[in-house]
């Protein structure tokens, strides 16, 4: 399995935008759709009424989660999204764009504040819980609100899927500071990240998804 560092992945995505004219929005749409198709094919092919919970951050990983939620909803899945709002300021960029799309498509999205009781109740009987909180840009110690959210997700008896990398895990070193999402499956976007292969006990089974990177870029890795 080919792996990349977080820096190399950012370079590939930047090259896709600047050299091949692929908009970042297109890459995110492709990633979210690929994840939705994988979930449908592997877990929901016979019963789409099982509950799916997607918990998003306000960065790129959260955007992937919102896109995935929209596609699952359009396919008739019982899906609910939660999102941790920015500590300061407001939503920006692709996350804001996909929140608007979620609103117009009637996808259920709730913000997570200090009271986690609603999230606890939701994940308690969920069939699948998806971690779309923190991505490859994360380094260091997990902030309190994210830490508490991760603990709630880990308490669920559901199938647990991490988008790109489990939240709390360093994408390069595979280290964590204690608060880390423990996945049964990790859906690596484009390429598996180096840290995943160093933390297989946390990442579970790694599945690499196509996010629409040009063949010319894929061949350089």
From Swiss-Prot:
Kindly list the positions annotated as binding K(+). 61, 131, 167
What does the record give as the reaction this protein catalyses?
(6R)-NADHX = (6S)-NADHX; (6R)-NADPHX = (6S)-NADPHX
Q: Name one GO molecular function term.
A: metal ion binding
SUPFAM superfamilies given in the database record: YjeF N-terminal domain-like
Co-factor remark: Binds 1 potassium ion per subunit.
Domain YjeF N-terminal, which positions?
9-219
Fetch the PROSITE patterns from UniProt. YJEF_N (PS51385)
NCBIfam families hit by this protein: yjeF_nterm
Q: What is this protein called?
A: NAD(P)H-hydrate epimerase
* Natural source organism: Elusimicrobium minutum (strain Pei191)
Q: List the lineage, top down.
A: Bacteria, Pseudomonadati, Elusimicrobiota, Elusimicrobia, Elusimicrobiales
UniProt gene name: nnrE
């Amino acid at each position: 399995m080919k792996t990349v560092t977080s820096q190399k992945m950012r370079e590939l995505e930047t090259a896709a935008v600047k050299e091949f004219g692929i908009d970042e929005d297109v890459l995110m749409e492709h990633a979210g759709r690929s994840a939705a198709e994988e979930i449908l094919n592997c877990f929901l092919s016979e019963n789409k009424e099982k509950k799916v919970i997607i918990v998003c951050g306000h960065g790129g990983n959260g955007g992937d989660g919102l896109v995935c939620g929209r596609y699952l909803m359009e396919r008739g899945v019982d899906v609910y999204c939660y999102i941790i709002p920015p500590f300061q300021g407001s939503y920006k960029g692709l996350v804001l764009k996909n929140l608007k799309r979620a609103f117009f498509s009637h996808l259920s999205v709730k913000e997570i504040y200090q009271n986690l009781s609603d999230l606890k109740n939701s994940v308690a009987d969920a069939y699948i819980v998806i971690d779309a909180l923190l991505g490859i840009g994360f380094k260091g110690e997990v902030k309190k609100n994210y830490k508490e959210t991760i603990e709630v997700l880990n308490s669920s008896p559901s199938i647990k899927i991490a988008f790109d990398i489990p939240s709390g895990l360093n994408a390069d070193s595979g280290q964590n500071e204690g608060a880390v999402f423990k996945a049964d499956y990790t859906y690596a976007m484009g390429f598996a990240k180096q840290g995943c292969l160093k933390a297989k006990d946390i990442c579970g089974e790694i599945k690499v998804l196509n996010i629409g990177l040009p063949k010319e870029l894929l061949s350089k890795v």
